[in-house]
Amino acid sequence: MTRGNQRDLARQKNQKKQADLTKGKRTDNLTVEQRKARDAELMREKQKKKEEAAAAGTSK
């Protein structure tokens, strides 16, 4: 006789376990300093675009 949903429960438990194992890991393989530098550059570009848009909006 089979045990019903035992396979489904084991699958759900394993999926949760795998999700917990990979939760905090990053896939970009950057150091903290590299990540900070990359993020800072992106924010500078974003701020520059915003300032240009504001300047273009006020000069019309």
Curated annotation (Swiss-Prot):
* Chain segments annotated as transmembrane: none
- Bias type Basic and acidic residues, positions: 1-53
Domain of life (superkingdom): Eukaryota
Q: Which GO terms describe its cellular component?
A: cytosol
Query: What single Pfam family name could you report for this chain, choosing any that match?
Result: SERF-like_N
Q: Where is this region: Disordered?
A: 1-60
Q: Which family does it belong to?
A: Belongs to the SERF family.
User: Entry's PANTHER family?
Assistant: SI:CH211-39K3.2-RELATED, SMALL EDRK-RICH FACTOR 1
Q: What is this protein called?
A: Putative SERF-like protein
